A protein has these predicted regions:
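Extended, charge-rich alpha-helical scaffolding segments
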Residues: 2-87, 96-97
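Short terminal interaction segments
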Residues: 86-163
Length: 163
């Protein structure tokens, strides 16, 4: 590939890395909010945060695709090896630092997502246990509730017309 083509693609790749960095920060903020909502038991916030998180993931996906296309444009493979080669060709420590920061943010997001998964599983388990306790209590007392929340007694005893 000609040097001028590589040089022309470099500013776009560098600018893309800066935009990716901002997008990762937004995703990390959304994950922090989601984690805190789970810790605080604020389930009503989760749908909004999930929508925000999904939008950020789509943005990141688009940015990564753009970066891959930029690497292809300069004759490199669209992967980690291609990125490392491009960074080596640039020879600028600030570009390496930006790339390292992006990789660190990705690892941080993965770790946060795993913690969120554990918190969700804990909440679901706690809810299942509470539901089981309520169902067992209702069964043992012979009482159940209808859709309106009114007590419904079972017909296990003698009919009222029996002597």
């Amino acid at each position: 590939m000609a040097q001028n083509e590589t040089s022309a693609a470099s500013p776009a790749l560098i600018a893309g890395l800066a935009v990716e960095s901002t997008a990762w920060q937004f995703l990390l903020n959304a994950l922090k909010q989601e984690e805190q909502a789970l810790v605080d038991g604020e389930a009503d916030l989760l749908p909004k945060l999930n929508a925000l998180k999904m939008a950020q993931l789509q943005t990141l996906n688009n940015l990564v695709r753009t970066r891959y296309n930029g690497l292809l444009a300069v004759g490199l493979t669209p992967d980690l090896a291609g990125m490392e080669t491009w960074l080596a060709q640039q020879g600028k420590p600030e570009h390496h630092a930006l790339w390292d920061a992006l990789q660190a943010m990705e690892q941080q997001a993965q770790a946060m997502n795993q913690r969120i998964g554990v918190l969700i599983e804990l909440r679901l388990s706690s809810t299942r246990q509470a539901l089981n306790v309520l169902v067992q209590a209702a069964k043992s007392q012979g009482g159940m509730y209808d859709q309106a929340g009114c007590a419904v007694t079972s017909n296990r005893g003698k009919p009222l017309t029996a002597a």
